[in-house]
Design a protein with these regions (language model features):
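Gram-negative bacterial Sec-dependent N-terminal signal peptides
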Residues: 1-22
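Hinge/cleft segment of the Venus flytrap/periplasmic-binding protein
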Residues: 24-59, 191, 195, 211, ...
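Flexible loop/hinge segments that line or gate small-molecule binding clefts
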Residues: 25, 128-166, 177, 187, ...
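Extracytoplasmic "Venus flytrap"
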Residues: 30-50, 60-79, 83, 87, ...
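An alpha-beta-alpha
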Residues: 61, 65, 80, 170-216, ...
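Hydrophobic alpha-helical segments within soluble ligand-binding/sensing domains
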Residues: 105, 160-186, 199-202, 230-232, ...
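Hydrophobic alpha-helical
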Residues: 119-139, 207, 224-285
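Exported/periplasmic ABC-transporter solute-binding proteins
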Residues: 246-247, 255, 259-326, 330-340
């Protein structure tokens, strides 16, 4: 049997204690409540979000994600898992394999509920394609929480998300500030993600509206799944067809794959990259200077809040129906002012699909 040295053992204990302290100390968290709830034009007001200390019983939750192909959803998974553990509830975590698999997501949720799931947290593949499912859940008195992506249903119990309109708007405004009206034209290749997804259409609208009146010339949206191979091909094709491109803007996966493509094509001094949401690789890119900036929506916290909302709904306790973390745009200038553990999962975290 291999012996563990005292310093190594102590380091492990201290790391575990540190992670436990971070989990316990995530709240109160600076967030924004939307009123009226579920309104695209609702007014946002500041709120310090605090969850329940513990669940009254070991509820069984179903949690559904579009996929776990990128670090963004890994971060949501981390938030969901840690909050379920902290509250003392069980969770089955499902992933549908991609944004083309709406029917699979629906059947996974239905199967989980049939297996005894008492509340559902949904990172929706489609804003409109899950409306009937949410309606049927309400008819069965099963709370449905909309996390991250957005579902267009009045039958939802609550939403834990930020406005991806605002995320796109923040990214667009960051670029527009560098290129005011009257300055030299700059071409932007824009990759908002998979067509039809609620978060994509919202981000696209926010981005395109933010750059109006600037000297930026934004190409028509280049849609596609957020798998790395898909995004890499889209970026390669865009750079090949339009040598005038100065900026690559889009999903975190777009930004991640663009770093290597820009370097391989010797375009580091000509083409810059910006994401409209943060992942660990985007964060690392900002640190290295290969990615300019990204709004941060604290996906870990969104996952945590969604689990708390589900438990509150099951226990008939007060809940904020529409809430999300306050958005901040991160670049190299302010990177060190942001607490990493609030906005990203630990580097060592691996996907977990069950909390018992």
């Amino acid at each position: 049997m291999k012996k563990i040295s005292a310093p190594t053992l102590l380091a492990g204990v201290l790391l575990s204690a540190s992670l436990a302290a971070q989990a316990a100390n995530w709240y109160p968290y600076a967030a924004e409540q939307t009123e009226p709830a579920f309104s695209d034009t609702g007014v946002k007001k500041p709120v310090n979000y605090s969850p329940l200390p513990k669940a009254a019983k070991k509820w069984k939750l179903c949690v559904s994600f579009p996929h776990m192909k990128d670090a963004y959803w890994l971060g949501v998974d981390y938030g969901v898992v840690e909050e379920a553990k902290r509250l003392g509830v069980s969770a089955q975590i499902l992933e549908a394999g991609g944004y083309t698999n709406l029917n699979k997501q629906i059947s996974q949720i239905e199967d989980c509920v049939a297996g005894g799931g008492q509340a559902v947290v949904i990172g929706g593949i489609s804003a409109d394609g899950l409306v009937n499912l949410v309606k049927s859940l309400k008819a069965k008195n099963i709370p449905a929480i909309d996390v991250i992506n957005g579902i267009n249903s009045p039958d939802l119990t609550a939403k834990s998300l930020v406005s991806f309109y605002t995320m796109g708007q923040e990214a667009g405004a960051y670029l527009a500030k560098k290129h005011p009206a009257g300055s030299a034209k700059a071409v932007v290749a824009w990759f908002p993600g998979p067509a039809g997804a609620g978060w994509v259409e919202a981000a696209n609208k926010g981005f395109t509206e933010a750059v109006k009146g600037s000297s930026l010339e934004v190409m028509a949206p280049i849609y596609g799944d957020t798998g790395k191979e898909v995004q890499a091909k889209l970026v390669e094709d865009a750079l090949q067809s339009n040598p005038a491109i100065r900026y690559i803007a889009g999903t975190a996966v777009t930004a991640e794959v663009s770093q290597g493509i820009v370097r391989a094509r010797n375009l580091k001094d000509k083409v810059q990259v910006i994401s409209f949401y943060l992942t660990p690789d985007v964060y690392a890119g900002i640190e290295k200077g290969t990615i300019m900036a990204s709004p941060a929506d604290a996906m870990v916290i969104q996952g945590r809040i969604a689990i708390d909302q589900a438990v509150r709904a099951l226990e008939g306790k007060d809940l904020i129906k529409h809430v999300g973390p306050k958005i901040v745009t991160i670049d190299k200038a302010n990177l060190k002012q942001i607490r990493r553990d609030d906005v990203l999962p630990p580097a060592s975290f691996k996907p977990l699909f069950e909390v018992k």
